[in-house]
């Protein structure tokens, strides 16, 4: 019976043919990864390619090799470019071949890590234990893989909310309660959105002024807390940033931990970008205080170089973490003493998802394959390249730094030019791809150096490209 004649069942008629096709697909992607420099970083899909993608809903079967051929022709060459060594536009890692292979294994297992007793969950538990050790949270900490730090930060705000308002808030909902959270003006927008989604509201988040290094001003924070206390409000959460989205600034985490302890507020660190800097000896001292956080969010798909997506939440108090998410009334989620429904803690009791993919596997593979020292060396390398870029900018009379370089992000401008147009032209050229941001009302070129493949030649290409385009603008008047 052919695939076309089947009424049910999706396994192939011929496993050998599928195996051969699978090998071709794997070889194609390994070839693709190993030749990134030979192709444009980014190119816009043509109208014809978009049209070929926008077809009627397929009712009948197709040939896997034809779908693969379309992918290689119309999809693979037109990605966002973050794997390319010249990509510096947004804070995205470059992925790894090891991570890609691990994703293949995870897809083959098709494990749901929502709960129950199976080894894929043990892999996630092991990574949680490693992160608890790395960040000094201790063996009683809990953690969970998530899509990204946006969701991890949301969960951290929920945990802090329930800590302040009590478990009954899960039953009664948020009423007119006098609690307030604090973060710097450079905090990621997902913290602001989390205040909305947790029912607390944007008005209960104080965005505090930053200092010359774009880190939160501790005196301004203390003044805001004093004003809120005088108005009868209670601080419940202080958010520190380890690598701000615009400039890579790192807040004084130890100072924030002191203030949070004094005020009885939860201390959360958004470490999406910079938390893994603890692996780099030259960066780690600047993250002092991160080990005192009540919760920490980070992304392995940034400086950790894991393929998307691999967000992570670490929580010091596992019991408080579980109280925020567990729901014991669902009979279909009842734990058993033995059998498949047994096992230790279930991830679904520590987060919003019942259906969870095997995100932990690619991180587990990378940590075991490369080791922490190699990952730390990559982080040190990209931060050193950022300093190299800053030095190149400072040495050019046509360019200027727009912000201090705190980690791996360099914000600069071509003096008197349309810098947004320069960035767009660089994208179209396909060699390097920074992004733009706005600092103090000015448009700046923002180079976020994250990719483990980026080398000094890519820094040279960026500087030379900006200079050439800026000079061309000036010549046109």
Region locations from a protein language model:
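A short linear hydrophobic-aromatic micro-motif
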Residues: 141, 397-401, 431-436
């Amino acid at each position: 019976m052919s695939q076309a004649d089947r009424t049910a069942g999706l396994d192939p008629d011929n496993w050998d043919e599928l195996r051969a096709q699978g090998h071709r697909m794997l070889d194609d992607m390994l070839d693709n990864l190993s030749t990134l420099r030979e192709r444009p970083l980014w190119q816009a899909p043509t109208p014809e390619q978009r049209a070929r993608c926008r077809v009627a809903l397929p009712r009948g079967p197709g040939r896997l090799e034809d779908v693969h051929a379309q992918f290689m022709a119309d999809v693979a060459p037109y990605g966002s470019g973050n794997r390319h060594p010249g990509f510096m536009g947004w804070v995205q890692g470059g992925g790894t071949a090891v991570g890609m292979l691990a994703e293949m294994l995870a897809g083959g297992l098709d494990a749901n890590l929502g709960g129950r007793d199976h080894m894929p969950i043990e892999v996630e538990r092991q990574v949680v234990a490693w992160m608890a050790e790395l960040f000094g949270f201790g063996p009683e900490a809990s953690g969970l893989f998530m899509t990204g730090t946006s969701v991890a930060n949301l969960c951290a705000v929920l945990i802090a909310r329930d800590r302040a308002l009590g478990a009954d808030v899960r039953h009664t909902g948020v009423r007119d309660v006098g609690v307030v959270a604090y973060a710097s003006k450079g905090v990621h927008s997902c913290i602001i959105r989390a205040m909305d989604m947790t029912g607390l509201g944007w008005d209960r988040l104080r965005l505090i002024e930053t200092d010359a290094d774009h880190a939160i001003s501790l005196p301004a924070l203390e003044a805001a807390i004093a004003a809120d206390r005088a108005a009868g409000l209670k601080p419940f959460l202080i958010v520190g940033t380890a690598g701000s989205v615009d400039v890579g600034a790192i807040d004084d985490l130890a100072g924030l931990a002191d203030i949070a302890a004094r005020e009885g507020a939860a201390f959360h660190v958004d470490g999406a970008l910079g938390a893994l800097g603890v692996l780099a000896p030259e960066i780690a001292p600047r993250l002092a205080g991160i080990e005192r956080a009540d919760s920490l969010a980070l992304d392995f798909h940034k400086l950790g170089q894991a393929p998307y997506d691999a967000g992570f939440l670490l929580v010091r108090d596992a019991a408080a973490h579980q109280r925020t998410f567990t729901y014991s009334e669902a009979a279909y989620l009842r734990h058993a003493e033995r059998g498949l429904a047994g096992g230790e803690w279930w991830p679904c009791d520590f987060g919003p998802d019942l259906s969870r993919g095997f995100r932990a596997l690619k991180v587990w593979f990378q940590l075991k394959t490369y080791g922490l020292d190699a990952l730390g060396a990559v982080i040190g390398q990209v931060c050193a390249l950022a300093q190299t870029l800053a030095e190149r900018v400072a040495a050019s009379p046509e360019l200027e730094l727009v912000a201090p370089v705190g980690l791996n992000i360099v914000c600069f401008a071509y003096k008197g030019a349309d810098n947004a147009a320069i960035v767009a032209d660089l994208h179209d050229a396909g060699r390097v791809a920074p992004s733009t941001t706005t600092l103090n009302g000015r448009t700046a070129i923002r180079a976020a150096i994250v990719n483990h493949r980026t080398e000094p030649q890519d820094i040279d290409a960026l500087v030379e490209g900006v200079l050439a385009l800026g000079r061309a603008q000036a010549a046109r008047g």
